[in-house]
Amino acid sequence: MAKRVGIVGIGIMGTAMMRNLVKDGFEVVGYDIAEQAMARLAEAGGITAASPRDVAEKADIVITSLPGVDAFEQVIAGQGGIASSNGKGQIVIECSTLPIDVKARGEVRVAAQGKILLDCPVSGTGAQAARKDLVVFVSGDEAAFERCREVFAGISRAQKYVGTFGNGSRMKFIANHLVTIHNLSTAEALVLGEMAGLDPALVYDVIADSAGSSRMFQIRGPMMVTGQYDEPTATMTTHLKDLDIIGKFAADLHCPTPLFNTAAQYYYAGVAQGRGSQDTGAVCAVLEKLAGIERKG
């Protein structure tokens, strides 16, 4: 009999997770408010459910990958939400990037119904998720984590248990803080090369193999070279949500973040320029506009 797992939220990340789980032999039961997402699930061989509650009643382990606070609260505690599902002992693997206090309220809500919510943000782009190249930062009930190891292995290359509930999100904020800076530094380096008269493809090829490289340089450098941002692995608009969360997290800790604060401005500029639905690599186009370069659209 196939192993069964649930998934709620079948966007860029959720779709990649769902497809990898199906490939690994899991029977996937899923739900998303978008018809196109449900169609993707069915096309991949998954089972469509009527609500988050329906998913939790059909699978003892449920992954949630959601775009924001409102979606999370609706999925957990709204009408037809996971907290209202019958049965006890279900585990919710919560992979979204959200404020810790929001997830903590969700944890309390499901715990009151005899269920467990793990705080498990993932590190990686949508393209990395598609090839199972994610790292999961797991926090919360360690015994529940052990019960979910096979599911985690179905969506990621590595799983890091980081302790008490909320530490997963803290790690994710730090990771995305660096992604924000490294992504912009990649764009800045390529624009510098362009203005120096160097071929962008050559700059990428040489620097990607140098001490100045980074994971973001290697992942987003190629799309910056071609200027193709319309098949996003993470959109500019979604990243603004993360910037707000990380900025508040650092401010609450009175932690100076001069590089992050400076970098964030260019993502806001990208959305203001109409690039909200594009990949965050489009921050390169923002810099090119400032530099007067018209190589890319």
Each model region followed by its residue ranges:
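Rossmann-fold NAD(P) dinucleotide-binding segment
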Residues: 52-64, 68-116
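Interdomain hinge/lid region at the active-site interface
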Residues: 169, 215-276
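Active-site-proximal catalytic alpha-helix in oxidoreductases
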Residues: 132-139, 160, 164-196, 205-219, ...
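Hydrophobic beta-strand scaffold residues
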Residues: 28, 48, 117-118, 159, ...
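Rossmann-fold dinucleotide-binding core
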Residues: 10, 98-176
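NAD(P)+-binding Rossmann beta1-loop-alpha1 motif at the extreme N-terminus of oxidoreductases
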Residues: 1-57, 61-64, 90, 126
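NAD(P)-dependent dehydrogenase/reductase Rossmann-like domain
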Residues: 273-297
